[in-house]
Amino acid sequence: MLAPMDTFRLFLHVLAASVWVGGQIVLGGLVPTLRKISPEAPKLAAQAFNRIAWPAFGVALVTGIWNMLVVEDLDQALFGIKFLLVIVSGAGAAIHIVGKSKAALAVGGALASVGAIAAMYVGLAL
């Protein structure tokens, strides 16, 4: 059984990661429908998502570093891989936000989603 603070830290981490990863998956699924509503609808939905997603990304990042500092038997190599995937996901999302071309939007979105899903998978191995 985990200590109460460990449970709280892990809860915050999983909740934040779920918002970041799950939100990308849900928004990706909604884009075709949003495009039918209005050409601007996907952009407006993405902007609304960003107001929730980026704070969640920050919480996941902070609690992930917190985990690294307090978990004694943490596999450092595996944690390093996960951290790199998280950075790839965040960078991809940033590229997707500022990208002007279809290629930048596609590459940024793919990096964000694949990096996030891969980080979640590696996190389960920790």
Question: Which residues make up each language-model segment?
Answer:
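Polytopic transmembrane helical bundles with strong interfacial aromatic enrichment
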Residues: M1-L126
